[in-house]
Structure formats: structure tokens, C-alpha cells
Amino acid sequence: PIAITHANPAFWHPALRNKSGDVLKALGESGGMLGFSLYPHHLKDKSDCTVGSFCDMVARTADLMGVDHIGLGSDLCQDQPNSVVEWMRVGRWTKGIDYGEGSASDAGFPPMPPWFGGNLDFGNITDGLKAHGFDDADVEKVMGGNWLRFFKESFGPLN
């Protein structure tokens, strides 16, 4: 199965990396996984995105794909200098710079939303999912359980 490791639905925010409802529906139907990106350029309202908006998007995507096919794919580059993003943007064959959702005038890392400044803030997402009606079992799936199952089923022994 296919994994889209860090993107969001285009119905929520039309970033270049984000995927259409048709792609996400097919991904879920085929047993694939979507990892929700927390990179500000992929978020509705970017650095001003709220945890409520993010968790509402997760709930809408669960309705579209099924809760067993979604998880977090944070795309977190915590405490990295701008030289890291500069290195990532250089084309390996073209040697041209691809700014993706950024621009030449604003080429560095955008600030993270206040509710997710780093890996110590995953609990804010857990709390947000519960506030949006996810039960404990589904929160556990979204927060990592689905990825563990997907990896086990997709990369386990062949015999």
C-alpha cells in the first residue's frame, strides 16, 4: 500500500503538497496511509493555524478515508538552521532552487503554530482530537497506532 507521509487535504488548504479528496478516498480504499503535516506552509492559516482547525480537518478526513488510514506525519524540523531548508530546496539534477510553498524573499523556516512548537507538544493534538469527539481508541490510532500497524503489515517478513 501507498503512504503519503506528510500532506493534508486540499479541501482544507490548497497547498501544493496537499492532496485532493479523490486521491485521499482512493488511498483509504486501497489500505494506504496519510500522515498529516504540521509544516506551516501546509496548514490553513499557516503559522496562525489553530489546533481546533487542525483537528476539525483530521475529523473530516477520517470521515472521508476512515480513521484506520490516518496519522501524524509532522514534517517537523525542530531547531534546525535555515541552511537545512536551503539544502533541501536545491534540485539534485537541475541545481535550481525550488521554494515549494515559500519564496526567495521568505526562504527560511516559517514559525510553527503556537500549539505545536516541537515534539513536546503532541499532547495538544491529543487533547484537540478528544475535544472533537474522537474516543480514546481512535486517538491512539491517529497518534501513532495506525502507523505501527501499517509498518508491521507493509514491511514485515514475507513468509
Give the role of each language-model region.
Residues L38, M65-W115:
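Short acidic/histidine-rich active-site segments
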Residues A10-W12, H41-D45, Q78-P81, L148-F151:
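Flexible loop/turn segments at secondary-structure boundaries
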Residues P1, T5, T50-D63, W87-G100, ...:
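Short, electropositive alpha-helical surface patch
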Residues G28-D48:
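A conserved active-site cap/scaffold subdomain adjacent to cofactor or substrate pockets
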Residues P1-A3, L16-G32, G52-D68:
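Histidine/acidic residue-rich metal-binding segments in metalloenzymes
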Residues A107-N159:
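Mid-to-C-terminal alpha-helical segments outside catalytic/metal-binding sites
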Residues L34, D75, V139:
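Conserved, mostly hydrophobic/aromatic
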Residues N8-N18, H42-D56:
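Active-site glycine- and acidic-residue-rich loops that bind
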